[in-house]
From Swiss-Prot:
It holds the Pfam family Methyltransf_25. To M.jannaschii MJ1452. This is Uncharacterized protein MTH_738. InterPro entries: Arg_MeTrfase, Methyltransf_25, SAM-dependent_MTases_sf, UCP006607_RNA_methylase-rel. Gene3D superfamilies: Vaccinia Virus protein VP39. It comes from the Archaea. PANTHER family: PROTEIN ARGININE N-METHYLTRANSFERASE (PTHR11006), PROTEIN ARGININE N-METHYLTRANSFERASE 3 (PTHR11006:SF53).
Length: 248
């Protein structure tokens, strides 16, 4: 099937690792009334249509929503709604698919949208993806601003450590605030956050070309070799300006 898309969504469709992880999860978990939030081109709704009784694809951008409507027009059990999921009036849902992911859930609306949508999920309902694991590692950089490091161009100064797991089926926090201890093999002046997505039990997807690029957060001070404790906080869905990190 050939999809009509914008250039950006064409890149999303070309990220085969991302699509495979979601397709496998959807094939084993989607059922009943399924919502696809932030549906984009409609590809995940297309996957879900084979397994769910009814799929409602919600997309707030009118241009890509029109594309999704055209892409899914031949499927009798799929409807496309051009509306913001933060304001949509849901019916009781059996499955919620929401791929508004970003590294550590900082710069996309995955958490704000799900916090509202979960109020309408049945007690035995399912969320795809299931969870995200966030990890950090020390790195050395020659810049001062937060930036993505898609190609892992900055060498690591120590091992990666998982510092948080966010489960999407339950009470979602808006803010992460905590400390993490990193082991550095050499002095460092930044941390790199890497997120891994659990789309369903046993299906884990790391950063892909179009999902969760590693994020580098420079520090004002330089950390010494050995164990260093970092204070880290951010608002999920609050954007990169909400990030604060410092050496304790």
């Amino acid at each position: 099937m050939r999809f009509r898309v914008t250039p950006y969504h064409g890149n999303l469709l070309g990220d085969h690792e991302r699509l495979a992880a979601f397709r496998e999860a959807i094939s084993s978990r989607a059922r009943g009334l399924t919502y696809d939030l932030g549906a984009g081109s409609g590809i995940l709704s297309f996957f879900a249509s084979e397994y769910a009784d009814r799929v409602i694809a919600i997309e707030r951008d009118p241009k890509i929503a029109a594309c999704a409507g055209e892409n899914l027009s031949g499927l009798d059990n799929v409807s496309v709604v051009n509306e913001d999921a933060l304001h949509y009036e849901f019916s009781a849902a059996d499955t919620i698919i929401c791929e508004m992911l970003d590294t550590a859930l900082i710069d996309e609306e995955q958490v704000p949208v799900l916090r509202r949508a979960l109020k309408f999920l049945r007690n035995d309902g399912t969320v795809i993806p299931q969870a995200v694991f966030n990890a950090a590692e020390p790195v050395t950089v020659n810049f001062e601003n937060i930036m993505y490091d898609e190609n892992l161009s900055q060498p690591s100064s120590g091992p990666m450590r998982v510092y948080d797991r966010v489960e999407f089926r339950g009470n979602l926090p808006e803010i992460f605030r905590g400390s993490l201890k990193l082991q550095a093999s050499s002095p460092f002046n930044a941390i790199r956050i890497i997120s891994f997505t659990l789309t369903a039990p046993g299906i884990i997807c790391g950063p892909t070309p179009m999902m969760n690029p590693p994020l580098i957060i420079p520090l004002e001070e330089t950390g010494d070799k050995g164990e260093v404790e970092i204070k880290l906080s951010y608002r999920m869905g609050g954007g990169l300006d909400s990030v604060e990190a410092s050496i304790i």
